[in-house]
Each structure stands twice: as structure tokens, then as C-alpha cells.
């Protein structure tokens, strides 16, 4: 994956570049895959942290504080420290690693990268895979929250109908159109623009080049002049599009952590059921 064209190329690291630096004196490498995949082999020295399923469905202040404390604590138990670079990965440039990167940016970490192509790229390029696992060394790390990358239901509600805000639905077409219902109600946040997160990746599971990403988002009216709020079902796929937009230099991007599971369950919040495009 060429770095040319990305406004923030430091958010990604290639397999070749990581291979030159991996080791005790190098970055902390965190594997976000399921435990059974990690047990079959991982990058040398990687520590395991599966955050999948640890979701928040109420972004009011009290539950938000408790939830983020848990995530921050889990990251610290795996050795995250403010002074050490962190590289996150999963099977490809996927939602698990993107969500971990978003969490770390939310907590103010300034040296976090995603392994582009993930474990698959590492394996295809025949780099060393380890079956000797290292126990993580916990730290006392405490982040400093960057509220500007986080959206709550109140933040989204306040932005409805504003021309300078783009709300991007990263779910499947079926979820967006309300034919696949995964909450008390189906549908979409009013005025949201739909583009499924998978369009951020190429056929090899790496992020598309910067020019392709810019053109793709410009075509649907998502431009750097607008504040962007991403959402999905629980903040996973939304974090992926957050990263894609960060890569191409969007200055104001938030991920709605509660996403549709919260919005769809709250009967007091508005929704729409967009008409699927005609197949004629």
C-alpha cells in the first residue's frame, strides 16, 4: 500500500515496515482477533485483546464514563503506555483493529497505527509467525479524552438537519433501509448518507489509495468542509470509516459509539426508512 496521497499516512504501517521494527524495543503490537485465531499463531511478541462484544448502548454521561473506564483499563493491562507506539491488527484492515485505534485516539494516544492488510498480509508475505506467547506487562496508563472524536446520541440529535454536518451510515443496505432490523426499530438516522464500510478496502483487505477514497466520498457529498459523524450498529464499522476519513485528512470526524443499537432502541428519537434504489 503506497503512503503517497494520504494526509495522515502515519495511521497505517505496512507489513514490511513493521517487520523491520518488531521486537522488545519496538512498538507494542496488539492482536484484536478472536482468541482461537490468536492461539493458532500471531505476530512475534504480540499481546492479545479481544474487545469484540464490549459495546455500549447508552451514551448518557454515567454509563459512558463507566464503559470508557473499562476499555481504558483493559488497554493498560495489555501494556499500553503514552510513551510507546502501539500497532493494532486483526485479520485484515478490519473493524476490530480500527475500533481499537479509534479508542486509543479517543484516549489521546498520539502514536497508534493499524497494520494495513492485517495478519493476512503478514502471512501472505511469509513473515515470521510466533506460537510462543508473551505475557503482557500492565501499566498505570490513563488517557486524556478527546471529546471531539466521540459522538453521543445528544451530539447526533443536535446536528440533525445541519448542512455543515454529514452523518454517514456505514451499515449494510438492508440495515439502512430497515429491512434488517437489529434494534427495537429498523431504519436510519434522518438525513444520513449511506456507504457501507467495506467500500474503504481493496480486494486484498487493505485500505484503498487516498485518491480513490477521496473520490468515493466526494461523490456522496462527504467532504472535508463538513463535520462527519459515522455510525453503524455499535461503533465498530463506524470506527472503520472514521479511520478512512482520518487517512485522507478530514479534520472533524466523530464516531457515534452507541450507534443504531442505542438510537433504534430509543423510541423518543426520530428515524427514517429510506427507499431502496430501484433495480430496473
Give residue spans per PLM region.
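Positively charged, proline/Ser/Thr-rich regional signature most characteristic
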Residues: 2-83, 158-225, 265, 272, ...
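Thiolate-centered catalytic microenvironments shared by cysteine-dependent enzyme domains
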Residues: 2-9, 59-159, 180, 237-259
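Short beta-strand/turn micro-motifs composed of small residues
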Residues: 31, 90, 116, 171, ...
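C-terminal soluble interaction/assembly domains
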Residues: 225-230, 236, 248, 253, ...
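Cysteine-dependent PTP/DSP-like catalytic domain, specifically the C-terminal lobe
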Residues: 254-280
Amino acid at each position: 500500500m503506497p503512503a503517497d496521497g494520504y494526509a495522515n499516512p502515519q495511521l497505517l504501517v505496512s507489513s514490511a515496515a513493521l517487520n523491520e521494527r518488531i521486537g522488545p524495543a519496538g512498538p507494542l503490537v496488539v492482536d484484536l482477533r478472536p482468541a482461537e485465531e490468536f492461539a493458532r499463531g500471531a505476530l512475534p511478541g504480540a499481546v492479545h485483546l479481544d474487545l469484540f462484544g464490549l459495546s455500549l448502548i447508552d451514551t448518557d454521561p454515567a454509563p459512558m464514563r463507566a464503559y470508557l473506564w473499562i476499555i481504558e483499563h483493559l488497554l493498560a493491562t495489555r501494556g499500553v503506555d503514552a510513551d510507546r507506539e502501539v500497532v493494532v491488527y486483526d485479520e485484515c484492515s478490519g473493524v476490530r483493529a480500527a475500533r481499537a485505534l479509534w479508542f486509543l485516539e479517543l484516549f489521546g494516544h498520539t502514536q497508534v497505527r493499524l497494520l494495513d492488510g492485517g495478519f493476512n498480509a503478514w502471512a501472505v508475505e511469509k513473515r515470521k509467525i510466533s506460537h510462543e506467547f508473551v505475557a503482557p506487562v500492565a501499566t498505570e496508563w490513563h488517557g486524556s479524552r478527546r471529546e471531539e472524536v466521540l459522538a453521543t446520541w445528544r451530539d447526533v440529535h443536535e446536528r440533525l438537519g445541519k448542512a455543515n454536518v454529514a452523518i454517514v451510515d456505514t451499515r449494510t443496505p438492508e440495515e439502512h433501509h430497515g429491512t434488517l432490523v437489529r434494534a427495537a426499530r429498523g431504519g436510519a438516522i434522518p438525513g444520513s448518507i449511506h456507504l457501507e464500510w467495506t467500500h474503504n478496502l481493496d480486494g486484498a483487505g487493505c485500505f484503498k489509495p487516498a485518491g480513490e477514497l477521496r473520490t468515493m466520498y466526494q461523490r456522496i457529498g462527504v467532504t472535508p468542509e463538513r463535520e462527519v459523524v459515522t455510525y453503524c450498529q455499535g461503533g465498530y464499522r463506524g470506527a472503520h470509516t472514521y479511520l478512512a476519513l482520518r487517512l485522507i485528512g478530514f479534520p472533524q470526524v466523530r464516531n457515534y459509539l452507541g450507534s443504531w443499537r442505542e438510537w433504534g432502541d430509543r423510541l423518543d428519537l426520530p428515524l427514517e426508512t429510506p427507499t431502496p434504489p430501484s433495480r430496473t
